């Protein structure tokens, strides 16, 4: 038996087809008497807010997609290993402020986005007429990811007790360090909870299929 078309089913029931993970995050990470925020760092960053009486989840902006595209353009590498290139640069505050004006970031949730918006063409439009160093742009893109996540937290408007991070972005050491500095609550990879950060979404698909078959 093959179970598929999860995103289409979500849209048929009034959703946006993404993110699909919040219900699974609840199964994995909800803790008694604690509010837990789960950050998934794929190409796009999404957050799930878990408390005893609610589950909130939506996309908040780019995670790795812009950084991966930029390092491929300038260093012919598929990703910035450990965030080392970003760590060699400095945040360009005027550029960061400009990127944060993107209207999507200020829409209320639930919402979803993707590479159809956050891509190198979008970035190039913001860089037109500037002459910033490539490594400084990479560092600014990393900070932009963190600021998008912080803005998402602010929009939820609740105090969080624990931050759990999953997805490929957990391997970006500079990104994880910057995230940890951004929040007062402890911020850890899902690996600390016995969940491989690289396989959360793959396991999600198996979990949804099992739930579907069980009725």
Q: Which sequence ranges carry the predicted segments?
A:
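Glycine-rich phosphate-binding/hydrolytic loop that grips phosphoryl groups
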Residues: 143, 188-215
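Non-transmembrane, aqueous-exposed alpha-helical and coiled segments at domain scale
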Residues: 137, 152-156, 179, 189, ...
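Glycine-rich phosphate-binding loops at beta-strand->alpha-helix junctions
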Residues: 160-180
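Phosphate-binding/catalytic loop of phosphoryl-transfer enzymes
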Residues: 6-78
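Phosphate/pyrophosphate-binding loops at sites that engage ATP/ADP/AMP, CoA/4′-phosphopantetheine
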Residues: 130, 150-161
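Generic structural signal for well-ordered alpha-helical scaffold segments
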Residues: 25-30, 143-154, 210
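Conserved ATP-utilizing enzyme core subdomain
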Residues: 56-146, 150, 212
């Amino acid at each position: 038996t093959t179970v598929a078309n999860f995103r289409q089913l979500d849209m048929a029931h009034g959703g946006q087809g993404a993110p699909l993970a919040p219900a699974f995050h609840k199964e994995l990470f909800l803790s008694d008497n604690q509010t837990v925020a789960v950050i998934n760092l794929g190409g796009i960053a999404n957050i799930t807010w878990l408390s005893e009486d609610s589950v909130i989840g939506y996309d908040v902006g780019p995670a790795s997609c812009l950084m991966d595209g930029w390092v491929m353009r300038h260093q012919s590498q598929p990703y910035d290993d450990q965030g080392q290139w970003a760590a060699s640069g400095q945040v360009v505050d005027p550029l960061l402020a400009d990127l944060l004006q993107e209207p999507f970031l200020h829409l209320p949730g639930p919402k979803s986005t993707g590479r159809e918006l956050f891509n190198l063409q979008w970035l190039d439009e913001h860089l037109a007429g500037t002459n910033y160093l490539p490594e400084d742009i990479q560092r600014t893109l990393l900070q932009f990811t963190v600021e998008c996540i912080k803005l998402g937290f602010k929009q939820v408007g609740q105090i969080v007790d624990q931050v759990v991070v999953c997805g490929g972005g957990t391997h970006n050491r500079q990104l994880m360090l910057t995230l940890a500095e951004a929040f007062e609550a402890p911020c850890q990879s899902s690996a600390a909870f016995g969940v491989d950060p690289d396989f959360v979404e793959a396991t999600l698909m198996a979990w949804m299929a099992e739930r579907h078959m069980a009725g």
